[in-house]
Amino acid sequence: MTRLLSLFTTAAVLCGSTGNAAWAQTAELQSTFSQSQLASMAVAFGIPSNLFSADHDVEMYRVTYPMPYLGDTVDVSGALFVPMGFEEPCGLPIHVYMHGTLFKRTDAPSFLGSEGMFGGLMATLGQLVLMPDYVGLGTSQLMHPYVHAQSESDAGYFMMKAADALSGELGYNLNGQNFLSGYSQGGHAAMALARDLTTTGYGDEFALSGAAPGSGPYDISGTQFPMTFDAESYSNPAYLAYNVIGWNSVYGTLYDNLDEVFQEPYASTMLDLLDGTHDAETINDACPPTLEEFVQPNLLDDIFNNPDHPFNLAAQDNDVYQWIPEAPLEMYYCTQDEQVFYENALVAESWMTAEGSTMHEAIDLGALDHGQCAGLAIFGATLWIEDRVEACTDGLPETRHTALSMHPNPASNQVRLAGANPSTPWKVIGVSSGQVVLSGRGETVELERLSPGMWLIQADGLGRGLLSVAR
């Protein structure tokens, strides 16, 4: 039976107003997943059974909560996945998963769209999984501000606040660990939230434990857009219209009329297509095959020749890589990504390294395209987080899996296992297949037989860890 739970609190409106307003979070039960259902779902997604265990039944709620946006307070929605069967004083870690590009409001996680189903698989491992829908998606009827860093971050942070506030009503406790992941647009959103949990007061309430974004456009101004417009065509022209219209709904400076950006007949059709009821395929099919036919002829020259062009200023405002991590940060990418260029991760890695960071890595998952990369990045991030979660046994926290330390990582020819000795047994497992491809004993693993990509290494008594092989 659908259950509606409401909690009313009073809080300061953080954007625009300094007065107080009554804030309300609601949680409506949408579905319950049994362990057997989740195990079958994992098989359907191709997750190796020897690397995944459905440990808990899961309840999924649609949470509606307030957040600041453009000087006002708006209601947004998200999916909350609660693992069942814990007894006090066990506490759960928060895992915020940020979803990728969606055009239809009802494809959002709280409506259990395909990406939303991942939440149950993550939660069954013993994590409280939060999946914000974002402004303009889910139940929100506003225009979605596509890849707008501040609203993405706020959607995540204020859902964390809502989940904390609802804990008593829904019967769970939190253990103080806070993890982030996300793919594609979700990689950008996870990076934005990781930045704000590190560099703003958001982290005073929710200290970041680790983040593992995948294939996100972290450097929009210097990498993603220049590389997009340097080509004759782009794989998903609908994204360009989504971005321009979404950002203009925030800044109001990119255009007065859409025909200043796009040629006809496309300028007259894009607003109707981006009304939250059409999917990506429909919108892409309505776009021309080349950028030359889509974008106004002189616009790109104006943008590239004027650093202060409103489009450049908006892009810079939504770059999300110029900050120093204080918790582990793993940035997954694939080298054949045709949608989000992998150089975004390399630019972020280079900038952070130059600024003295030692907490970050850019992980090459191999020569895969955007779609092929998704499952590996999302599952890899889930394994990485699981190895850092404090599981609760008999009321006492302990790590569910010990995280194996390996150096170097990424590696090309050889990796050293920290704490190993000449007799330590180890094995290398394919993350996609779950099959053991190498085994042996010792302090080092020779990698010549492994193709570039992500591999799981298990060492007896030392735990397991994800290794990136790059050449």
Located regions from the model:
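Short, surface-exposed "cap/lid" segments of acyl-processing enzymes
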Residues: 70-75, 83-121
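Residue-level detector of functionally pivotal "anchor" positions at catalytic/ligand-binding pockets or at interdomain
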Residues: 390-407, 413, 435
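Catalytic-loop region of hydrolases
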Residues: 23-87
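C-terminal catalytic histidine-bearing segment of alpha/beta-hydrolase fold enzymes
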Residues: 307, 312-313, 339, 346-347, ...
